[in-house]
């Protein structure tokens, strides 16, 4: 069996059912554009660490197979290597290989999250501007719940339990070509502030017959990621916050939750991280900073500051 044949089997048997749709699509891109052109026709039994090493070095220096392409960055190389290693690990479990030649190589750990965490004043400016532009419900939810962009636009109205103030997020639902696609049933549930629930109720009242949480008014279909980025860019331009990316809303939610006293394991569940170790790695600088503050200042002051941080999002909701 060639590597190409096994990768196709691995994608359909394992990856499609274990990964989010966007992750599956990203994996498919890496296989198609980087791994298969060089290694696809090699039998698994003949794949050695020398062959894998030459492949990785070639990709690092010369990039993909298009003429004139430049070398690949460290993050892309790490992703290629990790994906190949993951696939070959499964080949061993399937009894098709005795060892994994990709494990002969190591890449440095990825850098910690480089986040722009909004200050309380910036959050007020951002949300005030979102309200003026008519975008408040979507972006208030993004900021207070830490949702990914793809999760946000794929929400359905019945994901919200108004009575319990909970939102169930489907981790295997996505918007593709302006249609909702379901790939599985994996979910996580988070609790929302009552003010956010009230905003969502008002948003749904605009289109009470739509199953969508957020429906584009002109097309009556889900928003595309490009549309959400356009709306976000409109907000930050008018608010004078050009340095704030959409993903910084999620980071801000995470950091404020830590300052609130939320445990890392609980935050990992809220953000949809598969392992708490990912959360600890991403937000280690903030965890260390908080630990140092607790050690360096009187306990009373620490509790007072934590209480102030705990009230930030609540105060923002009381316009």
Task: Mark where each language-model region is.
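N-terminal core-binding DNA-recognition domain of tyrosine site-specific recombinases/integrases
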Residues: 3-4, 11-96, 112, 221-227, ...
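Basic, Lys/Arg- and aromatic-enriched nucleic-acid-binding interface segment
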Residues: 70-74, 78-80, 93, 97-155, ...
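Proline-centered turn/helix-capping motifs that create local helix->coil transitions or kinks
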Residues: 92-101, 161-165, 201-210
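C-terminal catalytic core of tyrosine-transesterase DNA break-rejoin enzymes
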Residues: 93, 136, 140, 144-151, ...
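C-terminal secondary-structure termini that scaffold catalytic or DNA-interacting sites
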Residues: 164, 175-198, 202, 218, ...
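Active-site/catalytic core of tyrosine-dependent DNA strand-transfer enzymes
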Residues: 172, 193-241
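Catalytic-site neighborhood detector that most strongly recognizes the C-terminal catalytic loop/helix
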Residues: 173, 271-297
């Amino acid at each position: 069996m060639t590597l190409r044949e096994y990768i196709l089997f691995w994608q359909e048997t394992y990856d499609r059912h274990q990964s989010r749709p966007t992750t599956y699509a990203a994996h498919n891109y890496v296989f198609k554009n980087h791994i298969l052109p060089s290694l696809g026709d090699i039998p698994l039994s003949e794949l050695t660490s020398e062959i894998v090493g030459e492949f990785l070095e070639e990709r690092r220096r010369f990039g993909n197979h298009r003429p004139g392409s430049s070398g690949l960055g460290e993050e892309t190389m790490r992703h290629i290597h990790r994906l190949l290693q993951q696939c070959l690990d499964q080949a061993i479990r399937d009894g098709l290989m005795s060892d994994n030649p990709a494990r002969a190589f190591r890449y440095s750990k990825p850098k910690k999250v480089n986040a722009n965490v909004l200050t309380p004043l910036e959050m007020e400016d951002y949300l005030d501007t979102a309200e003026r532009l008519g975008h408040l419900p979507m972006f208030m939810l993004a900021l207070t719940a830490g949702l990914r962009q793809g999760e946000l636009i794929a929400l359905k109205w019945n994901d919200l339990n108004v009575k319990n103030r909970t939102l169930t997020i489907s981790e295997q639902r996505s918007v593709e070509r302006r249609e909702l696609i379901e790939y599985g049933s994996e979910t996580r549930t988070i609790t929302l502030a009552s003010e956010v629930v009230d905003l969502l109720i008002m948003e749904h009242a605009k289109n009470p017959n739509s199953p969508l949480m957020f429906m584009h008014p002109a097309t009556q279909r889900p928003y595309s990621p490009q549309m959400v980025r356009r709306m976000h860019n409109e907000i930050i331009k008018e608010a004078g916050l050009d340095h704030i990316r959409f993903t910084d809303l999620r980071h801000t939610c995470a950091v404020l939750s830590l300052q609130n006293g939320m445990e890392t394991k609980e935050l990992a569940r809220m953000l949809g991280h598969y392992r708490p170790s990912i959360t600890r790695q991403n937000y280690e600088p903030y965890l260390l900073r908080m630990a140092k503050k607790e050690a360096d200042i009187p306990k009373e002051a620490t509790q007072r500051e934590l209480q102030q941080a705990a009230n930030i999002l609540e105060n923002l909701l009381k316009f």
